[in-house]
Amino acid sequence: MKGGSPRFCIPMPPVLVVEAVEWLLMECAYFRDDLCSSCPSIETAYTAQVQVKQEHARALLANYPQLQWLDPVTSAEAGFRNKAKLVVGGSAKNPTLGIVDYRTGTSTDLGECPLYMEPIQAAIPVLRELIQRADLTPYDIPNRRGELKNILVTASAAGELMVRFVLRSKKLMVPIRRQMDWLQEQLPNLAVLSVNLLREPVARVEGDEEIILSERQTLPMQVNDLTLHLRPQSFFQTNTKVAEAMYAQGREWVREVAPRSLWDLYCGVGGFALHAASVMDGGSVTGIEISAEAVASAQRTVAEYRLEGVDFSAQDAPEFAVSSGTVPQMLVVNPPRRGIGESLCAWVEGSGIDRVVYSSCNAVTLAKDLERMPSYAPVQGRVLDMFPHTDHYEVMVLLQKQ
């Protein structure tokens, strides 16, 4: 690697390990040179990474001897990430797209990070040139000067792109608009283009105000046999292939239970709810999500498929459940890392719902939530490696009322 380009990861030659098993290790120059620490396990054999995550999940849920663990869902080791959060640094003439030290303002270009899907990798040089052409001044964090803070890029499985410019103000909107035709020529797969305003000097990726510049307002995301719609501020899992397996597993559990009614709390753009509806044969499905943009995305999918009995609402999930006065026959929860918390756990514990699907991106809070619901026990579980080369993973459990 010495003397060559340090801006990419290459596989090391296969090495022989015990029992003649070949492991393909990855070496990342960004990681090696202490430029990026986002993938602390990247130099660990992938099979070993998955094994560690399985053991971690099993240890946390060791108090449930009846829990049957299904085979883990693994990921591609590179080219799997469908979203790039690119902090813009440097200058308009020589911009960097990658990460930044918020204390010093020092930026590191990660333009050749191999985790990104190919359409994102191909778009980064174009976006760098756009900054130069339009003279878009990067935001200087320590001095609180400049305009362009971040560029957020999302890719669909079909290769289409959503590109969002996160700005300090509307000052750069005119030069961005002037370059739209050029950008579309360079990126014919560009589906959605928007500006997001983050006026405050805070360490956030995006603000609350979005201005869509393109004619199209949603990025279609093909997931299994469904097309989900993604609006600019809607959350979507960063690993599409593993998300497909996650939703398919949820759908299979719903198929086995065959409920007449189901709630999907923290539903996002409706992945679990819409997959469940496809096997419920006319039952009612309700999706609850705090993000109005995500709910609008889910409602677009409902309208497109002309689904009946499927409703989405922008509400706080625990507040909705506690105040609803009714209970579904089956429940799906897919909370953020903090888990579903005490109030929702208490409601579930007293609800009498027979089966609950709990999909968690933090097995530690999952274990704590299960302790708060002693009348429910996990009967099946599955680890899904949504985030290769990190300590994070998704784990799903099917809970049964005891």
Regions flagged by a language model, labelled:
Residues 23-30:
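Short, intrinsically disordered, charge-biased short linear motifs at domain edges
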